[in-house]
Amino acid sequence: MATSQPTRVLVVAHKTAATPSLLEAVRERAAKGPCTFTLLVPKRAHGLHTVVDAQDQSPDEAREVIELAVPLLEQAAGGRVESLIGDHEPLAAIQDAINLQGFDEIILSTLPARVSRWLKLDLPSKAGALGLPLTLVTAQAREEA
C-alpha cells in the first residue's frame, strides 16, 4: 500500500526509555524512511497493584521518564517526538493508544528477562497479536536505568 503519510511509530518504554539500545532502534527506524514517533509510558500502578509490585514508581515518575527520554529520542529520531502517559497495565495502554491515535508500528523496549515484568507478562507476544509490526528492544544489563 503506497502512502505519502509518514509511518506512525509507537515507542513503548518505561525504565528503558533513555537506554542506548532503544535510542539506536529509533535511529535505525528513522533511517528507513519517513516516520513520526510517540513515546508511551504506562503510568504508576495504584491500589493493590502497588503492593504486588514494590518497584512501582511514584505518581510523577512517568512524567519524569518522559522529560528525560523525549529530548534523547528526538535527537535519535532527527525530529519531534510526541509523548503519552498510558494505563498502568501496559497492554491496555498500548491498545488505548492504537485505538485513539492510530499507529502503524510498535517498538517495545524492556528490561532484561531476569528483571522484566513486561517479559514475564508476555507483553511482546500480546502486543504483537494486535496486528502491527513489532520491534522488541531489550536493554543490556549495564544500560538499566
Regions found by a protein language model. Name each.
Residues 1-2, 77-104:
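Structural beta-alpha unit
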Residues 3-53, 136-144:
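Small/aliphatic-rich secondary-structure junction motif
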Residues 6-13, 68-87:
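Acidic/glycine-enriched edge-of-secondary-structure segments
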Residues 8, 105-107:
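Structural motif
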Residues 22-25, 96-97, 122:
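A short acidic, amphipathic alpha-helical/loop segment
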Residues 54-63:
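Glycine- and acidic-residue-enriched helix-capping/strand-helix junction motifs
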Residues 110-125:
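Glycine-rich, Arg-bearing micro-motifs that act as flexible, cationic patches
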